[in-house]
């Protein structure tokens, strides 16, 4: 996010590492892709002609960076970013002249008026995804509010993380630290209908930081957030894990992870045996912690270059990784039956196809064992794509014999009207 073109195509001391781990194996499984086609299963939650947000200063048709959650009451929520482009910082823009010209050439729409940039919005379904409410504002700070993600706690508090983006500074460093890209959190105490007005700033050891979610509720009821950011010593970007034991009021840094290259868009999960696993963009680095995040194995790659990985542990213990693929494109998925040490996929360097889209998929497991997945159609880099972007959804099931995946119809196929 610090340099948007990457998305288009005191020093921090990292936590000590556990014994280095060899890279995971990939078991290639021919015939494991779904027989049902994505276009026969997907539906649109928000997009052209479907449940668009009401106009606001700075809205130009872009929607994306979304995430779902299923609440204990049965309601489903999907949060997303709405703005005018792939990134929607407030105007007047804060970009170095060269970067601004590159972004305008790429498709940043000239002449936009967006006093507070993009905002985070939310929709709700009370009938298991068949119909959805009109989008309403979740949070609108002075910055672009990106990648809202959720977790519901034991007491039904709903915690939401997001990060803010103001643009890019001359020379790479803002003179005003308040302009930096930063992770924030807000809470709801009524099932996501109202939210705290003043976000909590996550204090990290980085000069800037980001998170895409998902937040992770641990077996003991505490919550993890995985972030990436720039250490004060300079690049490459590192990953870190923080934990809250008091419903998101405060957060403690557990450990940081570094490699010889950037670790971005990091994701973490708790395995059935209590071990934690983390993955990151762009090289698909994976590492594990056996001591609750204090130390981590050395990050290793295994040929799966990916963007926006998201890890989920299913009820049967299967570890699933949604990701965008650098080698084949599209939103894809692979899964593991042994905590990420062996992955099942259709190829050594790509997962099973979910849809030929830009990716950035997030998921939630449903009572029937299938996954409800939300994702965006395009990255919104080109102006026409930004003006007509859509948030899609689909369902997916790992086959009972683990021979691959099956795509299933989205709950709202044929249901497009928002609920009152």
Regions found by a protein language model. Give the residues of each.
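Boundary at the C-terminal end of the N-terminal hydrophobic targeting segment
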Residues: 14-22
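Asp-box/BNR beta-propeller blade signature and adjacent active/binding-site loops
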Residues: 21-420
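Bacterial N-terminal signal peptides
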Residues: 6-15
């Amino acid at each position: 996010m610090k340099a948007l073109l990457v998305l288009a195509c005191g020093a921090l001391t990292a936590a000590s590492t556990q014994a280095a781990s060899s890279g995971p194996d990939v078991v290639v499984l021919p015939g494991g892709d779904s027989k049902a086609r994505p276009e026969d299963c997907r539906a649109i939650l928000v997009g052209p002609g479907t449940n668009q947000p009401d106009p606001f200063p700075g809205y130009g048709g872009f929607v994306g960076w979304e995430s779902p959650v299923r609440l204990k009451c049965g309601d489903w929520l999907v949060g997303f970013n709405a703005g005018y482009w792939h990134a929607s910082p407030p105007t007047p823009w804060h970009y170095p002249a060269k970067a601004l010209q590159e972004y305008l050439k790429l498709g940043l729409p000239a002449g936009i008026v967006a006093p507070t940039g993009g905002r985070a919005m939310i929709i709700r379904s009370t009938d298991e995804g068949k119909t959805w409410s009109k989008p309403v504002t979740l949070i609108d700070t002075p910055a672009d509010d990106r990648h809202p993600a959720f977790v519901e706690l034991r007491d039904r508090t709903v915690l939401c993380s997001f990060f803010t983006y103001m643009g890019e500074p001359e020379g790479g460093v803002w003179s005003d630290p308040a302009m930096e890209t930063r992770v924030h959190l807000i809470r709801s105490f009524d099932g996501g209908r109202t939210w705290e007005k003043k976000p909590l700033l996550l204090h990290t050891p980085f000069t800037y930081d980001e998170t895409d979610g998902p937040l992770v509720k641990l077996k003991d009821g505490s919550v993890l957030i995985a972030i990436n950011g720039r250490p004060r010593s300079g690049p490459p970007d590192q990953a870190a894990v923080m934990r809250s034991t008091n419903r998101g009021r405060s957060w403690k840094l557990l450990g940081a992870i570094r490699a010889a290259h950037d670790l971005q868009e990091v994701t973490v999960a708790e395995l059935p045996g209590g071990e934690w696993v983390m993955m990151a963009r762009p090289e698909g680095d994976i590492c594990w912690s056996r001591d609750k995040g204090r130390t981590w194995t050395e990050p290793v790659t295994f040929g799966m270059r990916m963007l926006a990985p998201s890890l989920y542990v299913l009820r049967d213990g299967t570890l699933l990784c949604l990701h965008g693929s650098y080698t084949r494109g599209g939103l894809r998925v692979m899964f593991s039956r042994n905590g990420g040490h062996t992955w099942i996929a259709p190829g050594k360097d790509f997962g099973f196809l979910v849809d030929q889209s830009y990716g950035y998929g997030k998921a939630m497991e449903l009572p029937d064992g299938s996954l409800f997945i939300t994702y965006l159609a395009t990255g919104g880099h080109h102006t026409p794509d930004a003006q007509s972007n859509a948030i899609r959804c689909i369902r997916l099931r790992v086959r009972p014999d683990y021979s691959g995946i099956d795509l299933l119809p989205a709950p709202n196929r044929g249901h497009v009207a928002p609920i009152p």
